Amino acid sequence: MRFVHAIVVLIGITSASTAFRDLDWYECMLQYQIYPRSFKDSDGDGIGDLRGIVEKLDYLVDLGVDAIWIQPFYKSPMRDLGYDVSDYRSPDPMFGSMTDLENLIKAVKERGLKLVIDFVPNHSSDEHDWFKLSQEGMAPYKDYYVWADGRIINESHTDVPNNWISLFEGSSAWAWNEKRRQYYYHVFSIKQPDLNYRNRALREEIINILRFWLKLGVDGFRIDAPGWLMEAPHFRDEPLNPDGDKGFAALQHVYTMFQEENFDLIHEWRMVLEEFKNKDGHTRLLSVEDFSVPQFKARYMGNSTYLMAQMPFNFMFEFKDYEENATNINHSIQSYLKTLPASGISNWASESHDYTRIPSRFGAESVDAWNMLQMLLPGILNVYYGMELGLEDSFIRQDQRQDHIGRTQFDTTTRDTSRTPMPWDNTKNGGFTTAEKPWLPIHSNYVHKNVKSQLEDPKSHLNTFKRLVKLRKTHVIRHGRFDTYVLSTWVFMYTRTLESETIAVIINLGTETEQICANNVAQTLPGVMTVHTPSRNSGYQIGDEVTLTSLIGRPCSELRPKSGLVLSTSNADTYSSGCSIFSNCIINLIVLATVMSLSTKIID
């Protein structure tokens, strides 16, 4: 015999089925992130483009996507693969023309989808006309960027203005400009000078760019790098970080990150979006990239009288790997939800263009379980292209790398590994391009891990994903109460309950088969539930019965390592137009137990 201590932390979201509120389009959306270089090439040059996205819109509709977020397509010298913009109003020719972009916007709307685009306001390319004119000292561009004189060492020598460090370079964030005879600040690459938001003329330029895209019909923006938008005007040295090592981590970034004025800028941009909503009643979304602590996420959301971003990205799952146990997962979810302000909407992301994909952090066998974990949580789901297939990171040789970071500070890694082309079928280059060679090598497993083959396999990651998307649209998921449980060290469970219906999601994060005696810590659960969706590696089939309580002659069911189950008390086939969101203004937050320790006697 053995004794297992189960930690139970329950947060309840309650809602009466007769009181569903019609929520805005973004509040429970499945947003699909497209890295345009890697999604689909339409013209045979080896690089994905706007027409390629249009070609595959019907695939996204079939997948159940609500909105697509397209990463930078702006004109750029591509020193940071589009995050160094040289013209904020034009697509880069490698992606297509303005006509192609307008056709994409039209095609998205025709299919009932929403379109969110990346916006990169912290910096531009040094090849932007603004910078060229600024270095010449020409009005009104003279102070569009952060310029400073050097520190005087002696009569014949000067040094950089202060000790500020570049995130990308790992050395001084100041670069000398011979034409202007001053230094300019760049928190990222030397080719990405920071814009100066203490200049009112620049702020008006940015506002007009937002209006330009809103008039074209985009439904929202994802703001890149908002934490760095403004710097302290005094240019003092930043204090050393006692826990830091070298490079960017060597300093405490008290003067270059999360300045109070950053939040005012987000409010200013949100009010531009509200201008358009006031005209036609259609909400535009402002989301922000945010890797900060939960308290800053709440700040980015503002409040009912000071509107800011509706969605600061929640990347907590991106920083997790195979070391995470059930208690850690539970704590992360609870901590995040508890910091949401009254009007806050929860959102979840586990992959992106900057970080390693799920199967490369947790193992290929974990794909279905991790999709189950995140897809039925309350609020918004962000899906990085290929996540539905279980795409893995690729091995990219040094001579194949395209990412600037991979060539500088972080020599042992590169973001290219998670940016490789989407495999559409098992033909050459996965059907991504007709070119001899794509811009990055496609993963070598494309022959069996591609869209076409997975659509034909009922138990594939893709079809499991589609089944979960369908379940996301039911009343019990969109409106149901939310409770979390730790069944054992490595087994995590949460439930969604609405009236007499319950959905339970159970995942085994560990490396051994575990009993799932869920009824011991969730006494309101029935002793037996039906499998709605199994992970491929679980050993269960749709419709199987799972025993959640230990009875005489019938022990609890078991769950294989790295596998997951979605269990149901009913068929769960009803669709809903509403959404469940973790928001204190519309739900009843009930802390049933802060920490409860149970000793459960289990017969081996």
Description of each model-found segment:
Residues 2-3, 15-75, 102, 106-108, ...:
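Carbohydrate-interacting/catalytic domains
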Residues 2-9, 587-591:
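Sec-dependent signal peptide recognition
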Residues 17-211, 215, 228-294, 422:
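Acidic/aromatic-lined carbohydrate-recognition and catalytic surfaces
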Residues 68, 221-223:
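Hydrophobic residues within beta-strands of alpha/beta enzymes
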Residues 112, 126-163, 266, 270-421, ...:
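Conserved alpha/beta catalytic core and glycan-binding cleft of carbohydrate-active enzymes
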Residues 193-203, 253-258, 357-365, 371, ...:
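Active-site rim elements
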Residues 570-587:
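C-terminal GPI-anchoring signal of eukaryotic secretory precursors
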Residues 587-601:
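Terminal signal-anchor or tail-anchor transmembrane helices
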